[in-house]
Amino acid sequence: MIPVIALVGRPNVGKSTLFNRITKTQDALVADFPGLTRDRQYGHAQHENKSFIIVDTGGIGVDDIEVDTLMSKQSQVALNEANVILFLVDGRSGLTGIDQQIAQALRKLNKKVHLVVNKTDGINEDIACADFQSLGITDIHAISASHGGGISSLLEEILEPFITEMHEATDDKAIKIAFAGRPNVGKSTLINRILGEERVVVYDMPGTTRDSISIPFTREDKQYVLIDTAGVRRKSRIDEKIEKFSVIKTLQAIKEAHVCLLLLDANEGITDQDMNLLGFIIESGKALVIAVNKWDGLEEEHKEKIKSELSRRLHFANFAKIRFISALHGSGVGGLFKDINEAYHSAIQSFSTPKLTRLLQDISAKHTPPCINGRRIKLRYAHLGGHNPPVIVIHGNQLDALPESYKRYLNNEFIKHLGLVGTPLKIEFKGGQNPFANKKNKLSQRQVNKKKRLMRWAKNKK
């Protein structure tokens, strides 16, 4: 299981700064696609090839509201789902009454808690940490979220217990499909339609949380695992802040899966929550199929409106196949596995270095890179750097100055010429290094003696 790390603490201790610092450590896709929505309260991150999900639970103790009440409403869902809790405090302000109340509330959860003393740059770390010893938390880390100090060692320690578990999870040969979508969009109904039996209980109870359900499934001699992520069933009266964290189970399933099937509701169109889920799937680099459910019975005018909205709002996900289905009646469901298999095989496909290099040369010849300070950016060669998603590593000169628009051009051209369907493509750029950079020219002994003779001769001549 992909670990979930929750950030908790009173306001202004640096949770959002730490969240941004950690989520930026991942190698993002080629660029920030226009229109791509990223929810800033939960994110996918990676540290030294170890993936995890991080959740910012927000500030606790605002306006003197009782801490236990806030913990039970805003943060309890996220903290209960978390494998590790990072309790942030301010090393400059020292221990406060709210910090003590939060520590007391965290003890009741029986979770692994790390105390993270932030803002220790420029001050004595030992003295800053000593002020918080009375909280009784044994694992204490001094960091600077704004400057990045201490974060790498913090992540190494908290992720260490999950390394074996993460490696074991990659050994399964079955294709894992995560059914992602908002509550009541029809995920369980679709899985039941695929299985041909009522394997998943379909119900709607406000505030009810269910774990993800993994169901082994064989179709045409291929093995699959269908992952249903029911999450929290919400009604309008449920606190909106709680609803924010109802997707944590879905995020874990997305990280575990090979292919994500994002289910949309044709009656409601594309919502902000749909866009957040889609953004997380793309940032995770997973193969993607989009299914628009409840398509039957809609008037033609409404269908055209939905298609127009899909084209306008999902243009950055144009690599994904879109299929219009009815999970209840079965129309369009049969073609989903064709799209899923196509996306999976694109995601794991291999390409030789000569093929990628020739393609890079053809693409750059068609539209040459720009000149920087009178020198043209050179793209020398390309090779495959990974799978699911496919990673292409491009080597050259002055690649740091390559415009984002040209990176998008390369991305689109590679997807088109390689015939990739249903998977994002990740491109990494590595600049050529001068082997003589930062190296001082060392004279031989003969050259040193000659230099001394010349200096003596010049001195005597004066």
UniProtKB/Swiss-Prot annotation:
Residues 3-166, 175-348 form the EngA-type G domain. GTP 1 binds at residues 9-16, 56-60, 118-121. Residues 349-433 form the KH-like domain. It comes from the Bacteria. Keywords: GTP-binding, Nucleotide-binding, Repeat, Ribosome biogenesis. GTPase that plays an essential role in the late steps of ribosome biogenesis. This is GTPase Der. It comes from Legionella pneumophila (strain Lens). The gene is der.
